[in-house]
Amino acid sequence: MGDNVQSDTTAAQAGITDAPTAPTSAPVSLKERLEKLIESSQQLIKRMDENNIPDPTFAPECQEDYSKLPPETITERFALLDLLNDVTFLVHGASQSITDVAQNAMADSATLNILNYFNFWDVIPLDGDASFAEIAKAVRLPQEAVEAILPYAFSNRIFEPVTIGDPNSRIRHTSRSAAMIKDPTLRIIVNLTIDGLAGPLSILNRALEKNFLGKEKLTNEISETPFGMLYNKGGPLGEYKDYYDWLDRDGEGERKGWRQRDMVESLRLAKEKMGAESALLEALDWAGAGKATVVDLGGSGGHDDVPLAEKFPDLKIIVQDLPSCQPKFDDGYISDELKKRVSFLAHDFFTPQPVQADIYLFKWVFYDWSNKDIVKIIKALVPALRPGARVLVLDLMVDVGPEAAAVMPRSLLKYSNVISLKTLSLFGHTKQATKKMTDLFKAADDRFEIVRDEVAGTFMTFEAVWRG
């Protein structure tokens, strides 16, 4: 994954006196931004009118559908968000805009996490309202706490008082809070990203200071990551081998593994939206593979393999993942008929591969593992490989090259750049440590013959053949 976070550090600050002068962008002013904002806003209104999209509001019944807009409007909308952000910063002023982030960023996340964790969403009827006392009783928290949490949420258009200015007003949904009921996957996203990542991200500075101050390179050692400081050996929040072990084992009784189940579901939905099914079906000449045995490593609940098994009835597919993924495999999504050819085998892909197969498949697995770990995973295949066995890697291309970054809206770039912060906090590496599959497979074992190493759109396709 490539470099796309541009440093603003000057050559003088870096101790370089003969560095070439970098090109500078045109000055941005409040007046210029406001004028452009009006122009871009009118363009969006025109697009919505042309495609019969109702004017979005904060009413709970509102459910905007921007999917009807032409594909090019995705970038246009993010460019509009850039303008809105710039106007916000410039209207506040440099100092106040920084102060606002310092005061509000953590509170924004914490409030959303609290509302989600205690399920405020279902307490208030979509077409009704509730009092502070009724809400407090339903979520089993002191009313005093609820009266502090909800007003902050109001400022972010999450719930609202029925009567503005009345301290005793009843509370109702807005479109933002109602979305948490209409689309339950949003709850999973909040669980995974805020409840799961807030702790490690909040101590990233301490981890960098303790383990990497004055050093030139990261070590990729879990014990030196923020996650490791909290959850690894001697960690105050438990002892887990790594982030995935935590996902797999967190919780007790029926709750054990709930985070892993959420992760499986979120990945399934994300891949649906990104067209991952067609990418998998077109990644290989599956019909030409004949009666092949396919091992899908890190295959979660096996849902991705359903269209593959349906379209190519000669394939026998073995889904491998941690034990907590088996309930997803058994949830009825895969028919009994298909299960004659699609099975589940609990397996940790860092341990030696127990199955001899024709094709080993890694779908959207490697993008958040370090290069060192990827090499270990590949090496674990070797004991089972027969000459001619193939390894197919399909992965997300989350890096953005410098040329694309130069023209991409900053609001859109955030989705790519935030991955580096997350992986740095959880795994001790960044997506900037480019994952060149050819190099990684050769580092694992030079008996791999590289057949393909391609990038198309948001997907990377790699194929190697074992010549041992």
Curated annotation (Swiss-Prot):
InterPro entries: COMT-like (IPR016461), O_MeTrfase_dom (IPR001077), SAM-dependent_MTases_sf (IPR029063). GO terms for molecular function: O-methyltransferase activity. One of its GO terms (biological process) is methylation. S-adenosyl-L-methionine binds at residues 298-299, 321, 348-349, 363. Residues 1-12 have a biased composition (Polar residues). Pfam families: Methyltransf_2. Its EC number is 2.1.1.-. O-methyltransferase; part of the gene cluster that mediates the biosynthesis of the lipopeptide antibiotics leucinostatins that show extensive biological activities, including antimalarial, antiviral, antibacterial, antifungal, and antitumor activities, as well as phytotoxic. This is O-methyltransferase lcsG. It comes from Purpureocillium lilacinum (Paecilomyces lilacinus). The lineage of its organism: Eukaryota, Fungi, Dikarya, Ascomycota, Pezizomycotina. The gene is lcsG.
